[in-house]
């Protein structure tokens, strides 16, 4: 990629941000040297890695801090048999510990193929970690636990040092010696314990003079009684040094034996640091993975330049390459034209570097082989060239190298010279680039280019909207609408004499007046289209609310009807059973009476009556059973459109609107309502002839239930909040809302996490995300509901 283009599009500023976010030295070096790729497969692969990492971070939180140095030179030394120094060993130990921590962090990678493969490359060398931990406290301090021999040597050194200290303490407490000392203390020079002796009493304290004060008044003497002990300590110190060297060599050899797996783990950690750095940046910027293509298509939705403050950036929608290849943007200065150029160019560079873009899901970018940008006039200052010459030098280079796989971004094309010649030159350059198949976005002040864009095939106009009432740009990009200078309107609003304004209007050419009128008409049509779209969306929401309300009411009605039917059947059964019980008791009493009277004929007659009653009860019971079963078994054969039917669940008659599908579902119109029912829920209306009725179609619109678009649960416990959110989601779903917002605040994140865990299991929730700029960011969760 052209280095001038990278700088002009501020690509270097983004990778510098990522470099500072990365924790490991190798990852920082990666971002420092990162340049966009042109290989579609490599770019797609890198974006997929970042996508996995992004989703994992959202689900399981941020990863451990991967702060480590490049250990490859140290590993190479160990393989050659060299002894590593403590710092090198500790850095290798740090990598091994981070490998273990990352393996733990990546415990839930079953559905994340890339992260699962990375986890398998991370080693768990507890033996090496343990050996390093028991050896070093810091790079400069080796622990006694490093080896038993080292502990033994150091114990002897400490014992001898204590012996010297005891001897010296004994001397400074001796009144005979105290008068020879400058102070009754033990001083340290180098590693020696010494006494501060007055110079005039040099011969009174026998020993070796190791140092003296700046004035010469004090001599620092090691008494002879301590010299022999000091010599023993010196020997032990040498032994200590040799033992430490042996320990370092031992650990170096241990590392060398695992060199290959440590190297594999190191590379995995570096790659994880890189992709998670990109993922965390994407999370902070609310960025998304772009859809990539090689066919020259750009389609950005709500694109936000990452270097503009979140509360000030205005999202833009821009597309190129499908209906047109050259987009000419006109409009006032500081209206957002240059920002639009930079946004498109920067997003292409970020995408081709495997970095998400701050735009909505579904945004699409082409992988260009070349990207050129002529923005600003820095070269004119450095090289003492005019603005026009500096721009032209860049454009000459662009026209020489551009082809059908090139994106060209031109800011104020043709500026800095005579307007007529500049406009003519701009037309020729744009036409030339278009014929070469390049994709071009250019900004200009020249009105002639607006007409040129309307006349040329594969060209399109665009403008940055300007509010003439507030005299401020809105920064919205309007594709298909040429820009207006608004000079006369602005001047009039600012208070310029009306006579002057009208005089100026008279100097305008008829061509300019006609163009301004056409642009004004186009703007009016655009506003009307936006209003119609808004109305259509409102009607759509109302229709969805109607459908949801109807489905809910139908469900409630069917449930209640089934409950009543079952209750009636149960009551009928109870009556039959009760009657049977009472009759049985009655016959028992009559039988006893007949037996007492010894009337056989009466007894025989009673038995016959009993059997008649039993047959009657059985008949009634069978009728109840058949009545219940008939509601679910009776269906219609040879159903026809317009046929009159009875719908059991609604206890109403209607007409067939559509024939049953493969599952037996059909539409029936009852009055003004059209309902979806199953074939098992309808029956033929008896006594009807074969006449097919014509069904009048009517539209029904009801008002949406009064449900707020958001719910605030800040300050509530997780349990209380979830209960409220559950009820709210049911109401919102019933009302047909497509998107709602849950306000939980940032705080410690506990309430946010509890709500999100609940949302993952909720039957009405399609997806959810953090709020964007202006929505509340991480203090809210935006929920998309299912249809």
Swiss-Prot record:
Q: Which InterPro entries match?
A: DNA_mismatch_repair_MutS_C, DNA_mismatch_repair_MutS_core, DNA_mismatch_repair_MutS_sf, MSSS, MutS, MutS2, P-loop_NTPase, Smr_dom
Q: Which CDD domains match?
A: ABC_MutS2, ATP-synt_Fo_b
State the UniProt keywords alphabetically: ATP-binding, DNA-binding, Endonuclease, Hydrolase, Nuclease, Nucleotide-binding, RNA-binding, rRNA-binding
Specify which residues bind ATP according to the UniProt entry for this protein: 331-338
The Smr domain, residue ranges: 711-786
Q: What does this protein do?
A: Endonuclease that is involved in the suppression of homologous recombination and thus may have a key role in the control of bacterial genetic diversity.
- Which HAMAP family does this UniProt record tie to the protein? MutS2
Q: What is this protein called?
A: Endonuclease MutS2
Origin species: Caldicellulosiruptor bescii (strain ATCC BAA-1888 / DSM 6725 / KCTC 15123 / Z-1320)
Question: What high-level taxonomic lineage is stated for the organism?
Answer: Bacteria, Bacillati, Bacillota, Bacillota incertae sedis, Caldicellulosiruptorales
Q: Which gene encodes it?
A: mutS2
């Amino acid at each position: 990629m052209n280095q001038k283009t990278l700088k002009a599009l501020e690509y270097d500023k983004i990778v510098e941000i990522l470099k500072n976010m990365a924790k490991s030295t190798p990852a920082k070096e990666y971002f420092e040297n990162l340049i966009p790729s042109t290989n579609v497969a490599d770019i797609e692969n890198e974006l997929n890695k970042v996508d996995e990492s992004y989703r994992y971070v959202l689900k399981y939180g941020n990863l451990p801090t991967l702060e480590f140095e490049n250990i490859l030179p140290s590993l190479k030394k160990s393989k050659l048999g060299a002894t590593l120094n403590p710092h090198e060993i500790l850095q290798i130990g740090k990598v091994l510990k981070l490998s273990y921590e990352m393996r733990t962090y990546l415990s839930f990678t079953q559905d994340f193929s890339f992260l699962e493969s990375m986890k398998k490359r991370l080693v768990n060398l507890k033996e090496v970690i343990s050996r390093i931990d028991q050896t070093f406290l810091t790079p400069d301090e080796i622990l006694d636990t490093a080896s038993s021999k080292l502990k033994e040597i150091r114990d002897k050194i400490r014992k001898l040092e204590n012996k010297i200290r005891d001897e010296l303490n004994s001397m400074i407490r001796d009144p005979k010696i105290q008068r020879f000392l400058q102070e009754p203390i033990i001083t340290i020079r180098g590693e020696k314990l010494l006494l501060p002796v007055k110079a005039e009493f040099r011969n009174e304290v026998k020993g070796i003079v190791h140092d003296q004060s700046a004035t010469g008044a004090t001599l620092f003497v090691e008494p002879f009684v301590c010299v022999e002990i000091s010599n023993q300590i010196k020997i032990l110190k040498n032994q200590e040094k040799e033992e430490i060297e042996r320990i370092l060599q031992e650990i170096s050899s241990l590392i060398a034996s695992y060199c290959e797996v440590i190297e594999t783990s190191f590379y995995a950690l570096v790659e994880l640091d890189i992709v998670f750095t990109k993922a965390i940046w994407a999370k902070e910027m609310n960025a998304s993975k772009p859809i990539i293509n090689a066919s020259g298509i750009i389609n950005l939705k709500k694109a936000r330049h990452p270097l503009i403050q979140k509360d000030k950036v205005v999202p833009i929608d821009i597309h190129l390459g499908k209906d047109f290849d050259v987009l000419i943007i006109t409009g006032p200065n500081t209206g957002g034209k240059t920002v639009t150029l930079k946004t498109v160019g920067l997003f292409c560079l970020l995408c081709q570097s495997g970095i998400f873009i701050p735009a909505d899901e579904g945004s699409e970018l082409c992988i260009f082989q070349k990207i050129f940008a002529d923005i600003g006039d820095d070269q004119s200052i450095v090289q003492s060239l005019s603005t026009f010459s500096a721009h032209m030098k860049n454009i000459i280079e662009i026209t020489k190298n551009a082809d059908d796989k090139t994106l060209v971004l031109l800011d104020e094309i043709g500026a800095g010279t005579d307007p007529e010649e500049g406009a003519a030159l701009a037309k020729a350059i744009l036409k030339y680039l278009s014929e070469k198949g390049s994709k071009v976005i250019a900004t200009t002040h020249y009105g002639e280019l607006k007409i040129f864009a309307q006349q040329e095939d594969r060209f399109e106009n665009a403008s940055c909207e300007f509010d003439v009432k507030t005299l401020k740009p809105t920064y919205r990009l309007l594709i298909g609408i040429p820009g207006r200078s608004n000079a006369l309107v602005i001047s009039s609003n600012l208070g310029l004499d009306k006579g002057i304004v009208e005089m100026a209007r008279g100097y305008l050419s008829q061509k300019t007046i006609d163009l301004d009128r056409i642009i004004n008409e186009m703007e009016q049509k655009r506003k009307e289209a936006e209003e119609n779209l808004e109305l259509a969306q409102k009607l759509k929401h109302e229709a969805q609310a109607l459908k949801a309300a109807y489905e809910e009411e139908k469900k409630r009605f069917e449930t209640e009807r089934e409950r009543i039917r079952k209750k009636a059947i149960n009551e009928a059964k109870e009556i039959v059973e009760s009657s049977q019980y009472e009759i049985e008791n009655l016959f028992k009493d009559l039988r006893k009476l007949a037996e007492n009277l010894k009337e056989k004929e009466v007894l025989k007659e009673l038995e016959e009556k009993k059997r008649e009653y039993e047959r009657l009860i059985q008949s009634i019971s069978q009728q109840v059973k058949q009545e219940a079963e008939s509601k679910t078994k009776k269906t219609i054969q040879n159903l026809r459109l317009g046929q009159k039917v009875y719908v059991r669940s609604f206890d109403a008659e209607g007409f067939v609107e559509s024939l049953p599908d493969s599952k037996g579902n059909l539409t029936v119109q009852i009055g003004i309502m059209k309902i979806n029912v199953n074939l098992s829920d309808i029956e033929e209306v008896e006594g009807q002839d074969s006449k097919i009725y014509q069904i009048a179609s009517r539209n029904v619109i009801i008002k949406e239930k009064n449900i707020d678009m958001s719910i605030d649960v800040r300050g509530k416990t997780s349990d209380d909040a979830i209960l409220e959110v559950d009820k709210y989601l049911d109401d919102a779903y019933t009302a047909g809302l497509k998107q709602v917002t849950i306000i939980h605040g940032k705080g410690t994140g506990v309430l946010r996490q509890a709500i999100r865990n609940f949302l993952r299991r909720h039957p009405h929730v399609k997806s959810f995300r953090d709020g964007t700029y202006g929505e509340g960011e991480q203090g809210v969760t935006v929920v998309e509901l299912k249809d």
